[in-house]
Structures are given as structure tokens and as C-alpha cells.
Regions:
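Active-site palm subdomain of RNA-directed nucleic acid polymerases
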Residues: 280, 535-564
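Catalytic nucleotidyl-transfer cores of nucleotide-processing enzymes
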Residues: 238-241, 258, 363-517, 634-665
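C-terminal, non-catalytic extensions of nucleic-acid polymerases
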Residues: 592, 596-840
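Catalytic palm subdomain of template-directed nucleic-acid polymerases
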Residues: 567-596
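Common nucleic-acid-contacting/processivity interface regions adjacent to the catalytic cores
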Residues: 287-407, 416, 484-541, 561, ...
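DnaQ-like (DEDDh/DEDDy) 3′-5′ exonuclease domain used for proofreading
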Residues: 1-187, 306-307, 311-330, 337-376, ...
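Active-site-proximal helix-loop-helix substrate-binding element of RNase H-like nuclease domains
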Residues: 150-153, 160-166, 187, 191, ...
Length: 840
């Protein structure tokens, strides 16, 4: 077994760290890449479009850059090849499928603690800035992700108890030295942690530079090369530490990328509670963080730091996001930290696949001057209100399947003819040539060979299906014989099939990105509009077909909603006619059979029609049963609730709710309110208006007693500096209306600083998560709202608790959210007399 853990470029050298059968290895090589140029002679190597090219070796990577520049404007002379030389090297020297063992990778969780900056009188002056490292580090924890052992490095003696090996370094300077030496001794290959990219690693590196010098700081890299890159995002400077030879994988960013769930806060505290039911150690009994560090050192501070590492370790035990990222990386042959963007990932996949076929890629267009907008998916106006006995079907991997179906790829693209989706739906679109596919927007694709992109998509789909099948077989085997060798194999296969799924789902993100080497707006839009065609032909023709099949009155509507890759049907009339009086379980099973045997069958016929109209390369559009419910409620496009009894053939003992787009599932709704709203769904579906109104009245009484942070609105506060005014705090209407939550954040910052509390409480920086509440007027700040950081409490010193308008807060959160749902069925969330008062 041989696999890389880091491949990086330093000057003209490629620097490699890898794991082999004999252990870890690292080496540096002066890499001379291969480029390709146009050729009149047969060479056995061709471009994506079939032209002959020949290999050239200009020399070093710098020489290659100069070579490309030299011939850039020479007519009739073109250069081809992968100019991301790290990716080229990985593919060249790791040509086979890569198998890896995560346990052989030196992976560590990092968490640091710092003092807050103080003036000469010991007064806290704010919070530390990682780009300046303007406060001493007092504690550093590193946890081995495999053994789960935590090592804590501190500047003073520790006499308390903690689940860590404590090293008393005596001073900050010695502590930083010991950490660097330990880092090298353990040959750290991956460093993770919560917001480690945004704070810990940046602060640690800059602090080492400040205290020990850049030579010591650069020892964090096995190549003694570290770079701090500065960029600007939304007007805010951002810094990223690049430690050559070590991959920093921020677990918070992995969670945001791969967890598939939106959270009202991405603090470690919130996510740990959500995922593990565990929290960080509370230290609210101390005056401020410096007081906590000094007085609580032995009792809580050292355990607090260690626990942060342990929580990240436990999250990875459950979620296995590090292994998932590695699996994607090795499938694509990219570095671990490249997994966050689809463009580089798919650039590598396509380049590597083509090179195996002796084909080369064109140089990437550096201009990126395409300004076309791509039309997206189809969403049908729904039937608003209750839907009885809903069934939903969804397309299998819609966008990859569309690309396969019409053989959409740069080298198969033949240009455009006059055609539209409306023409195709009416059956008056032009007839494509025998060896041509025609998309609904008029893009033509050749059929005499399969293009690289559909070929890759199809290969990934087939591989994932096989891997998933093997995984399920091993799961079944484990249930029978409990073979202890199987769980690790099952986990590896599960990660691989998840990685393949993620790669497939991310493909359109690359194809529709103007920075992608193979970007073509006509291909990208052909993919989305073919999806529209599939849904619209179902909407247009299936109702009449089902009326005949079920012997229903002409004009009966079955298709009630379509969205991107899903179609929803109302089967209430069928249930009334054929299953009246039957138990729900019997009806659910009957509808499953109807969905598979009748609806899917008829949809397959319609997809055959789509295939014929487009002269498809192969039929790949298939729809399968998703959910069967007994009732649903549609509010508007992308906003609905379905009570699901069966999902993909699996029947639930107790039905589950699928909620889309409503405040019940939005992270901008307080968690307590979301929970209450979810608890009201059975009442909405099974009782009456007055029962729902009573539920709300009872909930108000509970709401009034809650702490402020539980009733406040969660929001993201972006670009707050652009709305700030040094005189009036925030922009007036004449200067451009300041969003309410931004105004709340600016007011908090102003009054915290005004009272000299900015050393005790963190200010709200632009881009952070906040909470805000309404205030009764008049009050001590003469404003109707106030905000505070999402993971903090509203400071008592502001004197605002007595002014919090809890009734208005309830109306704006709970009542308004409920009314948005009830409007669809003509109910009122509160009694009419109360409602009149609510709306003034």
C-alpha cells in the first residue's frame, strides 16, 4: 500500500509526503512536466477534439511557464496539457487506484487558548486578532485522532485533574518551542480543529514568529516553508496559513460542506449539542476569559481546552468527515484540502481519465470573460392547501443522467440550431440527424462515440452501485455471523459510495462554473432544460393517462407539484374510489404498488418519448418512488409539509414529517420555536382551527419565561461595516436603509464599547452569527432592537432585560411562522379579535 498525504510545489521542486509499506516517506524532486504541442505527424496522442499533438519537455516548471508564454500568440501553434503541476505529478506517479489506511496518517486536533489583550492597567482592550497574534498563548492542546490521547502544553503548573497529558513549559516561549518540537516528533500530516483555519493555526504561526522568530515558525512545515496568504471577501481581509507538507482541514468547514444540514450557529458548542448531546465546559462563573484562565486554571481551564479537542474527535467518530474527504481526494487524485471546490476536483478527474486514453486537455482560459446566465430547474406552481394521499417520485441522479442521455461533452458538441422547450413539448422541434442528439435549447451532440464527461458520469454511477451493493451484502453478513473484521470494511465501502455520490452531485457545479476549463453555457443549460422537459411532459400528459387507468372523471388532476427532479401526485380520489374504509397501513402498501407498477411504468413511457424527441444517445432518465404520505400541505413553491408513512419502500412504524422551505426548518427561526412548530403539525393535520389557536396561546405562556438567547432571532450579520456611521451608529434612511439585524449588531457594538465592556464581551465582527430581539419603547438606548453574538448572552450591564418585548417577539417568531402555514388553508393563528390587534 502506497499513498500520498501531501504533494506541494516549492519553486521548481515537487515535495511529497507519503505512506508506504515500510512506513512514512518524504522526498523532493525537481519535476519536469510534459506539455504537448500541435503536430502534423501521427504521434498516438491527440487532443480532446482528435487533433495530433506531440509531447515536449521544456524543462522545469518555471521553464514550462516561460514556454507557454513564449508561444502564446504564435499562429497555428498551440500548447496543451495540465499546468497545475501538482495534479499532473500526482497522476503521473500514482497512476493506479489508490487504497489508503487512515490509521497510518498522523492526524491531530489542535485547539489553542489565549489571554485577551490588556492595557498597562490590566484592563481588557478587546479580543485577540490572529493576524496580529496580539496576546499571549497560554495553553495548547493537541489530540491524536487515532489514540484519542490529548497532550496539553501550558505556561504554568497544573495541579488539577483532566483527561490529558500535561506538559508544564514554564513560559510561553518555552511552550511554543515544545509544541514545535512535538509537532515534528509526531510528523503531523493533517491538522484539524473547530475553526482551526480561521483562528488557531493562524494565531499559532504568527505568535511563534513574534516570540521565537520565523525560523522556528517555519519548522511547522517538514519543508520549513510556510506562507500566509491574504485575500479580501465581502470587503473583509482574510488570512490563510499554508504549511507546506501539512494539510489543515478545518472540521467546521468540512461540516458545512458535507453534513447536508443548515444550522442556526456553527459554533462548536451548538454543533456538539446537536450531534452528540454534549457541550463545551461552562465557565460563566468567572468574570471574563482572562479571569477564567488565571483563577480557573486547575479546576476548569485546562480541562476546557482539552474538551474542545475531544469534542472534535467525537464528531469525527460519528461523522467520519476526514475519511470522507480523503476518499474523495484519492478518487480524484487531488490534495485533501482541494475537496471544498468542484472545479479543481473535476479538472483533475477529466485530465487523468483523458491521459489514460492518450488524450490531452487544452490550456485553461485565463480570461473567464463569459457572462451568460444559465436557466435553472423547473418548479411548478403548486395546488395550495391540503393534499390527500400524496405520492412523490424523483429522478435518479438527474443532471448526470441528462448529460449521459444526450452525450453532452465538449468534444461531442456540434453547435446550435433553432429550437426551444416549448417547440419540443408541442412536437414541432427540428428533427436531429441520425447521429445527432438535440437538446431542448437547440444544442446538438454527436452520437458516434461517447464523450468523456458522460463516460465518467456513467462509470461513477456504475461503480457506486457496485460498491453500495457490496456494502449491503457485508452488512447482511455481519448481522448473521458478527465477524469482527467486517465493520471496518463496511465503513470503508460506505465512505467510498458516499464519496462517489458527492462527486456525481458536484459535477454540475463544475460544468456550470465559468472558471471551469471545459465550461460551455450551452452544455450547462442543456442539462437543466432537459430536466425541465422531463418534468413538464409528465405534468402535461400524465393526468389524462392516469384518469383512464383509474377510470376517473376527465380533468381529474393528479400532478400537483414539480420541483427540479421530483413530481408529486395527489391520490386522494383513487383512495376514495378503491380503498375507502381501509386501514392506513393497507392504503400505504397499495399506493406503493400503484406508484411502482402504474405511475413509474407510465413515466418510463414518457421518458421514452423524451428520448425519441431528442434522439438520445441512450435512455438514462428513470424515476423511482420516493415517498407515500397520508396528507400534505402546500403553502407555495418550495414550501410544503408531507406526513410520510413510507420512504423508498421502507414503511415507518410512526410517520415522519418532511418539511421544506418553512420556518419550521429554517436556521433563522429560534430552535425552541422550531421544536414547537414541529409539535403542532399533527394538530394542523388532525384537529381544527380552535385547537391550534389554543396550542399557540399555551405556547406563549411558556415562551415568555424563556431566557433571551432562546427567543432571539438567529441571523448572519454580513457587511455590517458598510452600514456603520460614526455619528448616528448606523446609516439613516436617506443614506440607504440598514437591515434590522445589522442595525441590532451595530447597536450592540456601540453600547458595549460605550460602557467599556469590549474587553469583557466580544464585539460582533462582519460575517458572524448573531441573535437579536425587539425592545419596548422607550428604553435606555432609545431603540426598538438589540443584538448580541450568537453564542453569548445579552450583557446584563446594558440594562435591557426589562425592556425585551417578549410578546412582540412571540408574535414575530411563533405566530407569524404559524400564520404563514395556516394562510394556505384559511385558518387564523389567533382568534379574530386578537388577530385584529396583532395587525394593528
Amino acid at each position: 500500500m502506497r499513498f500520498y498525504t501531501s504533494v506541494c510545489r516549492i519553486g521548481n521542486n515537487i515535495c511529497v509526503r507519503e505512506q508506504t509499506d515500510t512506513g512514512p516517506n518524504k522526498y523532493k524532486v525537481k519535476y519536469e512536466p510534459t506539455l504537448y504541442t500541435t503536430s502534423n505527424a501521427e504521434s498516438g496522442i491527440k487532443t480532446l477534439y482528435g487533433d495530433d499533438v506531440k509531447p515536449v519537455k521544456p524543462g522545469t516548471m518555471s521553464a514550462c511557464r516561460d514556454y507557454i508564454k513564449q508561444y502564446k500568440d504564435v499562429g497555428g501553434f498551440r500548447v496543451f496539457g495540465q499546468t497545475d503541476y501538482v495534479l499532473a505529478y500526482i497522476n503521473e506517479f500514482y497512476p493506479e487506484e489508490i487504497h489508503f489506511d487512515i490509521k497510518r496518517i498522523s492526524a491531530w486536533v489542535l485547539d489553542i487558548e489565549t489571554f485577551l489583550p490588556e492595557d498597562e492597567n490590566g484592563r481588557i482592550t478587546g479580543f485577540p486578532h490572529p493576524e496580529d497574534a496580539d496576546a499571549p498563548i497560554n495553553l495548547i492542546a493537541l489530540q491524536d485522532l487515532h489514540t484519542r490521547q490529548v497532550y496539553s502544553f501550558g505556561y504554568r503548573e497544573f495541579t488539577g485533574k483532566a483527561d490529558t497529558k500535561y506538559i508544564n513549559c514554564g513560559t510561553e516561549k518555552e511552550m511554543l518551542k515544545q509544541v514545535v518540537l512535538f509537532w515534528n516528533q509526531k510528523s503531523v500530516e493533517i491538522c484539524t480543529g473547530w475553526n482551526v483555519d480561521g483562528f488557531d493555526i493562524l494565531f499559532l504561526y504568527n505568535r511563534i514568529v513574534k516570540v521565537l522568530g520565523v525560523e522556528w515558525a517555519n519548522k511547522l512545515s517538514p519543508w520549513e516553508t510556510v506562507e500566509v496568504k491574504k485575500s479580501t471577501f465581502r470587503g473583509k481581509d482574510q488570512y490563510k496559513v499554508i504549511i507546506y507538507g501539512v494539510t489543515v482541514l478545518d472540521y467546521m468547514e468540512l461540516y458545512k460542506k458535507f453534513s447536508m444540514s443548515k444550522q442556526e450557529s456553527y459554533s462548536l458548542s451548538h454543533i456538539s449539542l446537536e450531534e452528540l448531546g454534549e457541550d463545551k465546559l461552562d465557565h460563566s462563573e468567572y468574570k471574563n476569559f482572562n479571569d477564567f484562565a488565571r483563577r480557573g486554571w486547575n479546576e476548569k481551564f485546562v480541562p476546557y481546552n482539552a474538551r474542545d479537542c475531544q469534542l472534535v474527535g467525537k464528531l469525527d467518530d460519528k461523522l467520519k468527515l476526514l475519511e470522507l474527504a480523503m476518499t474523495i481526494s484519492f478518487l480524484a487524485k487531488i490534495n485533501f484540502d482541494n475537496v471544498f471546490g468542484p472545479v479543481r476536483t473535476w479538472d483533475a478527474i477529466i485530465h487523468n481519465a483523458l491521459l489514460k486514453e492518450n488524450k490531452v486537455i487544452p490550456l485553461k482560459d485565463q480570461d473567464g470573460d463569459s457572462h451568460e446566465s444559465i436557466e435553472g430547474a423547473y418548479v411548478k406552481d403548486p395546488k395550495v392547501g391540503f393534499i390527500r394521499w400524496p405520492i412523490s417520485i424523483d429522478a435518479e441522479s438527474l443532471y448526470p443522467s441528462n448529460a449521459i442521455m444526450l452525450n453532452m461533452s465538449p468534444e461531442t458538441y456540434l453547435g446550435m440550431v433553432e429550437c426551444s422547450l416549448e417547440m419540443m413539448l408541442k412536437g414541432i422541434s427540428p428533427t436531429p440527424g441520425e447521429m445527432e442528439c438535440l437538446s431542448p435549447i437547440g444544442a446538438k451532440f454527436r452520437k458516434d462515440f461517447q464523450g468523456i464527461i458522460p463516460r465518467l458520469f456513467e462509470g461513477l454511477k456504475i461503480t457506486r452501485k457496485a460498491v453500495k451493493k457490496e456494502m449491503l451484502q457485508l452488512k447482511q453478513q455481519y448481522e448473521i455471523d458478527k465477524d469482527k473484521t467486517l465493520p471496518s470494511k463496511i465503513s470503508a465501502l460506505d465512505n467510498k459510495q458516499q464519496a462517489l455520490k458527492i462527486l456525481l452531485n458536484s459535477a454540475y457545479g463544475a460544468l456550470g462554473n465559468k472558471g471551469f476549463r471545459f465550461y460551455n453555457p450551452n452544455i450547462a443549460e442543456s442539462i437543466t432544460i432537459l430536466g425541465q422537459y422531463a418534468l413538464k411532459i409528465i405534468e402535461a400528459e400524465l393526468d389524462a393517462i392516469l384518469c383512464k387507468r383509474f377510470k376517473m372523471p376527465e380533468g381529474t388532476k393528479f400532478v400537483v407539484y414539480c420541483d427540479t427532479d421530483s413530481v408529486f401526485f395527489e391520490m386522494g380520489p383513487v383512495v376514495d374510489k378503491y380503498f375507502a374504509g381501509k386501514e392506513k397501513a393497507v392504503i400505504v402498501k397499495a399506493l406503493e404498488k400503484i406508484a411502482v407498477d402504474i405511475i413509474q411504468h407510465e413515466v418510463d413511457h414518457l421518458m421514452e418519448k423524451v428520448s425519441k424527441m431528442t434522439n438520445a444517445y441512450k435512455k438514462t432518465l428513470y424515476f423511482k418512488l420516493e415517498n407515500v404520505g397520508d396528507i400534505a400541505l402546500w403553502v407555495s413553491k418550495k414550501k410544503y409539509i408531507v406526513r410520510v408513512h413510507s420512504s423508498e419502500g421502507v414503511t415507518y412504524a410512526k410517520p415522519k414529517y418532511k418539511v421544506m422551505g418553512l420556518d419550521i426548518v429554517k436556521s433563522s427561526t429560534p430552535a425552541w420555536v422550531r421544536t414547537k412548530l414541529k409539535g403542532s403539525l399533527d394538530l394542523i393535520f388532525d384537529t381544527d382551527e380552535s385547537t391550534v389557536q389554543k396550542f399557540l396561546a399555551d405556547s406563549r405562556a411558556d415562551f415568555i419565561k424563556l431566557p433571551v438567547d432562546q427567543i432571539a432571532f438567529p441571523r448572519g450579520a454580513n457587511n455590517i461595516d458598510s452600514f456603520a456611521n460614526p455619528v448616528t451608529i448606523y446609516n439613516s434612511r436617506s443614506e440607504g436603509t440598514t437591515p434590522m439585524h445589522v442595525r441590532a449588531a451595530l447597536l450592540y457594538n456601540y453600547h458595549v464599547k460605550k460602557l467599556g465592556l469590549d474587553g469583557t464581551y466580544p464585539l460582533i465582527p462582519s460575517g458572524s452569527k448573531i441573535r437579536f430581539v425587539y425592545l419596548k419603547m422607550p428604553n435606555v438606548i432609545n431603540e426598538n432592537i438589540i443584538g448580541f453574538p450568537a453564542d453569548e448572552h445579552l450583557p446584563e450591564e446594558l440594562g435591557l432585560d426589562q425592556y425585551i418585548d417578549r410578546d412582540l417577539q412571540f408574535d414575530k417568531t411563533m405566530v407569524a411562522s404559524m400564520q404563514n402555514i395556516l394562510d394556505a388553508i384559511g385558518w387564523n393563528a389567533v382568534e379574530v379579535s386578537s388577530l385584529d390587534a396583532f395587525f394593528g
